[in-house]
C-alpha cells in the first residue's frame, strides 16, 4: 500500500512553527561515534536546538580511529564534547571488542526485503555489542539531566543497518518510556525524548541530508576495523553499507580505504 501525504493545514503549519521555536530554546545530547550516521545527527541537532553536547565512548572498541574522528568532528561543529570511559570489552561477546573474533565481511544483499523485525538470532552478526545502545543511552540520559537537555539524539536506522535489535523503533520507544519513569527530569514534568532522525532513512538519504546540513563526510570513519591511520578496511558490513550509500546517492565517497 502506498502512503499518500495529506495536505498540511494552516493549523498544522502553526503548530510546527511553535514546536520549532520551542526546540530552539532547548538543549540536546547527541551520541557521536565518529561515523557517518552520528555526524549527520550532530548537524541535524545543531540546526534545531539551542545547545548541543556530543557524547562519545572509549569502551574498548577494536580501534580508536573513530574517537580521533569524533574529536575532530565536534571541534569542527563547535559543540561541547564529552568522552566517557567504560570498559565493555571485559564482557566480551562481540568482534568489535574481542580481538580473537573475526569481523565478518559485509553483505548488503542479505536482507533484500528490509523486514528487519523478522530477523532471527542467527542473522545478527557478531559485530553486535551486547546491550551497547542501552549502555550508551543510559550514560547519555545522565548527561542530559546534568546539562538540562530535553532531547537525546541517536543515529539508529531500520533501513540500511546490520540487524541489531537495539536499533528498532520499539526499542527506542521503550527506552524513552523508561527514561521518563526513572529520572528526576521525567518525574518533575521535564519530558525527555529520544530523537531518531535517521530511523526511516536509507544510507543514501542520510548522506543527502547530511550534505544539505554542511557535513564533511571526509572526517568520518564508519569501519569496524580501521587501521591505526584511520584507513577503512572496505569489506566489513559498515564499509559495505557506506559504499552502497554513496553510490546510491550519486556522491563521491571521500573515505580512504586500505585497498
From Swiss-Prot:
Q: Please list the GO biological process terms of this entry.
A: queuosine biosynthetic process
| E.C. number(s) listed in UniProt | 6.3.4.20
Q: Residues that bind Zn(2+), according to the entry?
A: 223, 233, 236, 239
The cofactor(s) it depends on are:
Zn(2+)
Q: Which residues does the annotation say bind ATP?
A: 32-42
Q: From the UniProt record, list the reaction(s) this protein catalyses.
A: 7-carboxy-7-deazaguanine + NH4(+) + ATP = 7-cyano-7-deazaguanine + ADP + phosphate + H2O + H(+)
Tagged with keyword Glycoprotein: no
Q: How is the cofactor bound?
A: Binds 1 zinc ion per subunit.
The pathway is:
Purine metabolism; 7-cyano-7-deazaguanine biosynthesis
User: Which molecular-function annotations from GO does this UniProt entry contain?
Assistant: ATP binding; ligase activity, forming carbon-nitrogen bonds; zinc ion binding
Q: Do the record's keywords include Nucleus?
A: no
Cross-referenced InterPro entries: QueC, Rossmann-like_a/b/a_fold
Question: What are the alphabetically sorted keywords of the record?
Answer: ATP-binding, Ligase, Metal-binding, Nucleotide-binding, Queuosine biosynthesis, Zinc
Question: Which Gene3D superfamilies does this UniProt record tie to the protein?
Answer: HUPs
Q: Which HAMAP family match?
A: QueC
Describe the family membership recorded for this protein in Swiss-Prot or TrEMBL: Belongs to the QueC family.
Q: What does this protein do?
A: Catalyzes the ATP-dependent conversion of 7-carboxy-7-deazaguanine (CDG) to 7-cyano-7-deazaguanine (preQ(0)).
Q: Which PANTHER family match?
A: 7-CYANO-7-DEAZAGUANINE SYNTHASE (PTHR42914:SF1)
From the Swiss-Prot or TrEMBL record, give the protein name: 7-cyano-7-deazaguanine synthase
